[in-house]
Amino acid sequence: MSLVPMVVETTNRGERAYDIYSRLLKERVVFLVGQVEEHMANLVVAQLLFLESENPEKDIHLYINSPGGSVTAGMAIYDTMQFIRPSVSTLCIGQAASMGAVLLAAGEAGKRLVLPNARVMIHQPLGGFSGQASDFEIHAREILRIRENLNQVLSHHTGKPLEQVQLDTERDNFLSATEAVEYGLVDKVISHRELPEAEAES
């Protein structure tokens, strides 16, 4: 079991200890780290909904470092990002591959960021099925439907023609930070946190 650092915050009410992720959640930062699967997706969705209830007008910052994973789990996060009222800014740290790349691109236009040494990878969904021969055709059709849906999502958020996205996701397609900007998956490569306007002007 991995160790989660704790931070201690001192207020006029005394000291209070938080795990690091809970403390960052107070700053409206949500981490999407590791394999995209049902449990992780439920936690991310719950955090997004909580932050919306806290302040529906203030941006949420989604930090992504993920190799991808379950399409259904990922689409639960995607749909929630589109559903809630706050804008969701996305930032790729490390990598955003497969479903992680879709979620990176799904951030608010103009607020999708990538660190300079991160990488992004897009491809078609992987299919694996074992069972009765009569069910293979059903699952093959479902994989094709999912693939078409994901390509439409990427086309919508990148501005690329659907036919181009279909071609570019035939095989694993790795992009550097700069290439991800050129493709339209993100809006900007950043190497330093930008200062708030008030500090920049002083």
From Swiss-Prot:
The keyword Protease applies. GO terms for molecular function: ATP-dependent peptidase activity; ATPase binding; serine-type endopeptidase activity. It catalyses: Hydrolysis of proteins to small peptides in the presence of ATP and magnesium. alpha-casein is the usual test substrate. In the absence of ATP, only oligopeptides shorter than five residues are hydrolyzed (such as succinyl-Leu-Tyr-|-NHMec, and Leu-Tyr-Leu-|-Tyr-Trp, in which cleavage of the -Tyr-|-Leu- and -Tyr-|-Trp bonds also occurs). The active site is at 98 (nucleophile), 123. It comes from the Bacteria. GO terms for cellular component: cytoplasm; endopeptidase Clp complex. Its EC number is 3.4.21.92. The keyword Lyase does not apply. CDD domains: S14_ClpP_2 (cd07017). One of its GO terms (biological process) is protein quality control for misfolded or incompletely synthesized proteins. It is found in: Cytoplasm. Keywords: Cytoplasm, Hydrolase, Protease, Serine protease. NCBIfam families: clpP (TIGR00493), PRK00277.1 (NF001368), PRK12553.1 (NF009205). Cleaves peptides in various proteins in a process that requires ATP hydrolysis. Has a chymotrypsin-like activity. Plays a major role in the degradation of misfolded proteins. Belongs to the peptidase S14 family. Fourteen ClpP subunits assemble into 2 heptameric rings which stack back to back to give a disk-like structure with a central cavity, resembling the structure of eukaryotic proteasomes. This is ATP-dependent Clp protease proteolytic subunit.
